[in-house]
Amino acid sequence: VAKKTIIVFSGDLDKALAAFIIANGAAAMGDEVTMFFTFWGLNILRKPEKVRTQSKKGFLQAMFGGMMPRGAGKLGLSKMNFGGMGAAMMRKVMKQHNVSSVEELIATAREQGIKMVACTMSMDVLGFKPEELIDGVEFAGVASYLGEADEANVNLFI
């Protein structure tokens, strides 16, 4: 079985779409796929609703959480976002052309057994707690990603 890894660094809608389309395509072809979400890419995995965390966050971490998009449905475009208008137009065109949303692509990834891993160091820096992320996400550090990457024949950074 061929193995693919994707580092999802970006929290932009267009890049999240690319990452999940590639991951789902590889899984559909029978490949084992691991997606490692780090820094802004973690926003894709955030639950859309505000979550009360067990432990208290520091001021800067609370600020990060408040300023960043909460979940795949709130992501902006990397170019021509225009305060969210670009992303809204993109979602409309995608719907008209029957292109799956990021949320639908995440559901497909789960169904296909794609491993989604949140970077614990990035979570610490940004102040994200495990309960703030969607179900089915694993948690690991860079050593875990590197172990997976060593065994993969394709490693992408998006």
Locate each region found by the language model.
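Short, glycine-rich nucleotide/cofactor-binding loops
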Residues: I6-A16, L45-P48, V93-Q96
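Short, hinge-like loop/turn segments at secondary-structure boundaries
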Residues: V51-S55, I134-V137
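A glycine-rich helix N-cap at a beta->alpha junction
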Residues: T53-G86, M90, N98
